[in-house]
C-alpha cells in the first residue's frame, strides 16, 4: 500500500496495491502487519483496530461530524465499497496550528482509497452517488455516553460538500450539533490521546 500524507499531520490517505487481470482485481483491504510497518512510524505510535462498521446511505445523506470524547477516543480507517462519498476530517484539538481546518477526500468503489482519521478529529461524509456502502474500522468500541459532534453544515469550516443544501439529508441528532465557534473541544494538542 502507498501512504500519502495530507496537509494535516496524522491524517493519511492510503492507496492499496491492486492486482488486475481479465477476471477482475484483487487487493488486501487491510493488513495489520503492513499498517504497523508503514503507518505507525508516521504517526509515532501503533493503532489497533477492534471494531468494523458498515452503513448504506442514499444520495444527499450527510453523516457527522462525529467523534468520541476521552477516555473513549477513536481513530478510524474508512473506505467506500459501493458508490461515491466525500469524506472529511476536521481538526478539533485545542491549540493545534490546524484547529478548525479540514482534509476532504473522495472515496469511491473505483479508486479503493482509504482514509485514516486520527483521534482528536471530527469525521463525517456526504453521499454523492445514488447509494453508497461505507465501511470503517475503529480502534475503540462505540460508547454512546461519549458520543459528540459538531455541525456538518457549519459554513465557517469551509467544506464544499458537493451537495445542494436542499438535497442534504441529516439525522435529527446531527442537526443539533453546535457550530465550531460555540464548541468547547474535549481534545488538546498537548495531550497524547494514544497513551
Model-derived regions, located:
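Non-catalytic, conserved peripheral segments adjacent to functional cores
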Residues: 1-110, 131, 138-195
